[in-house]
Amino acid sequence: MIPVTKPFLPPKEEYLKYIDGIWNRQWLTNMGPLASQLEMDLKEFLDVQHLLFVTNGTVAIQMAIKALDITGEIITTPFSFVATTSSIVWEGCTPVFVDICPDSLCIDADKIEDAITEKTQAILATHVYGNPCDVIKIEQIAKKHNLKVIYDAAHAFGVKVNGKSVFEYGDISTCSLHSTKLYHSVEGGLIITQNPDLLKKLASIRNFGISGFDSFSELGINGKNSEFHAAMGLANLKHTEAIHNQRKKLSECYDKNLKNLKARKVVWHKDATQNYAYYPVVLESEELLLKIKAELDLNEIFTRRYFYPSLASSLPYLPKVEFPITEDISKRVLCLPLYFDLTEEEIDYICRIILKIQNN
């Protein structure tokens, strides 16, 4: 069996060294020393000013909305994981969808201003597959209309735009450290901001809104993460370069094998680095996608229709709206297996099946 993804695990002894320390200290959670160390190490690795390690990427988005005091409409993308939209609704705000760019698959920055109303308070955009949005144009729009900007950077660990971490754009960026991600802490998330006052507010929100032994400053949540999760994050961090290099090598193997596939790749931001978080292909038709997926399934090779269906037309708690580009792309995009342990021989096998179905 070849899964669509498989978590990277460090050598067991490296993880257990951290676990021995947890056992000795008996400090399991509540901003323990490993969680604090992970925050410091990640700030250095990612070259960001301020960062918090939290429960997961979804809670990170919810905390970001809360910290920025957003209560109205939030312009967002219908082509993302459901947590992007559900977090908006969970916080009592209204998502306003804007169609995506057919090349980058990120929110189309040229269409954002048409969606702005007197109720608009923020833009929440996703760096799809780690491919950065048009962060410069979005920043210009936000300044012009006095809007907050949150980036769902769940896929964008390690990516840089114009030599700067993609996490440093917007008021807040959030990242997922779920085990399916290229860098993970089993479960986990990050909140990144350049604003020290906002960081202080987010830290309080993460800890139930507590500001001292006997006082509260915010409406808070339990957004903390445990020492066990921090241990996995620390153990994995030293392997990130090897993980990146291997995923790049495997992606290039796909490129070589699939040069005659009736499909196109995502057009990457011209000023951004790649982290090879996913290998998506946009096939020429949904019919071809379904045939390929069915044959791969029969051979126990599992792919993912990521993201399908469109969030704007599929969520039971929102009015259904169809956006032509999102509807089209979501029906034709397929993510192929990509993970550290995948071999080039397995990729050759996957690609032979794909091309056989296409050419028959």
Q: Whereabouts are the PLM-identified features?
A:
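N-terminal "arm"/small-domain region of PLP-dependent enzymes with the aminotransferase-like
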Residues: 1-28, 337
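Phosphate-binding glycine-rich loop
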Residues: 27, 31-73, 79, 87-90, ...
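PLP-dependent aminotransferase class I/II
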Residues: 33-41, 45-51, 110, 114, ...
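Structural detector of well-ordered beta-strand residues that form the stable sheet scaffold
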Residues: 52, 75, 96, 149-150, ...
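Glycine-/small-residue-rich active-site loops that bind phosphorylated ligands and cofactors
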Residues: 103-104, 130, 181, 284, ...
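Conserved active-site segment immediately N-terminal to the catalytic lysine
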Residues: 151-185, 212-217
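Active-site PLP attachment segment
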Residues: 168-204, 227
